């Protein structure tokens, strides 16, 4: 039996098989400690583990259905059996769907709540008390600039990211002077498979905002977390988007975001009967071209 004092601290990356989570795992590996990658994809986990080892870290992988009711317990048992304790929890798993809420499958939309909200909350609340008792460690939660505004045509995704932001910022305040940090990461569009899977790549909004690499986001996320930051918004364009969302009233933002969330092949909301990209979307495309070279 391993005594509590003999447990080694580990960075646990939920959704570590790809995207931002995988990039954060690679950055964390530089500290040459244990990195535990948790996801459903065995191929992605194997590739991410190889990157962690190349970076100097010790990699462990766990295939886990994150929305299963016993996921936190199974993860803790996995750690305990290897003499590890969750010192840093990175919640980067999530997904979204694009389309009118009334047209998308109900099960798919409820799945967004299950993964983006319920699973993240359950894992966070499961591991935080141990961190507080040890007076060290913390949680890095992945939100998005989408969490600053309501998002017509990706209503549940935007709402879920708003939950993550408010939940994380509240915990950050609650845990001051405990030695534990909770940081919210809110990037703009990132060049990962998420854009294709969710359909977000089709929208004018995600095409106007410049995309950044997950490695860029990971570097700034880890640096911000290590320095105890409450909120990290990587990149000037993402910061400008977050600022605009904070300053403009919802009455102005909602119609704007709704139009920008349209895909090029969607019917134009003006009622012309034309495709959006051939009608009102043309003006947004011209705006995007005009912004190139101005917004990095």
Predicted regions and their residues:
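Substrate-binding pocket helix/loop in short-chain dehydrogenase/reductase
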Residues: 100-113
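Conserved glycine-rich cofactor-binding loop
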Residues: 17-18
């Amino acid at each position: 039996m391993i005594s509590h004092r003999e447990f080694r601290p580990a960075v646990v990356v939920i959704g570590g098989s790809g995207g931002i989570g995988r990039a954060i795992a690679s950055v964390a590996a530089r500290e040459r400690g244990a990195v535990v990658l948790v996801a459903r994809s065995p191929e992605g986990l194997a590739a991410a583990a190889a990157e962690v080892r190349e970076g100097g870290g010790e990699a462990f992988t766990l295939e886990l259905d994150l929305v299963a009711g016993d996921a936190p317990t199974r993860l803790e048992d996995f750690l305990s059996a290897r003499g590890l304790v969750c010192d840093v929890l990175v919640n980067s798993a999530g997904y979204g769907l694009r389309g009118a809420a009334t047209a998308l499958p109900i099960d798919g939309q409820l799945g967004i709540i299950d993964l983006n909200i319920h699973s993240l909350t359950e894992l966070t609340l499961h591991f935080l008390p141990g961190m507080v008792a040890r007076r060290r460690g913390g949680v890095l939660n992945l939100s998005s600039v989408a969490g600053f505004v309501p998002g017509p045509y990706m209503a549940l995704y935007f709402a879920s990211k708003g939950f993550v932001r408010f939940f994380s910022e509240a915990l950050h305040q609650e845990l001051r002077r405990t030695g534990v940090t909770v940081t919210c990461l809110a990037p703009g569009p990132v060049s990962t498979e998420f854009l294709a899977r969710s359909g977000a790549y089709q929208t004018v909004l995600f095409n106007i905002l410049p995309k950044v690499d997950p490695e860029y986001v990971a570097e700034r996320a880890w640096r911000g977390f290590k320095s105890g930051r409450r909120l990290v918004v990587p990149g000037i364009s993402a910061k400008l988007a977050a600022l605009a969302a904070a300053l403009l009233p919802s009455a102005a933002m909602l119609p704007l975001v709704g139009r920008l969330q349209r895909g090029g092949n969607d019917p134009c909301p003006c009622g012309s009967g034309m495709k959006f990209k051939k009608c009102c979307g043309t003006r947004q495309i011209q705006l995007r071209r005009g912004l190139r070279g101005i917004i990095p």
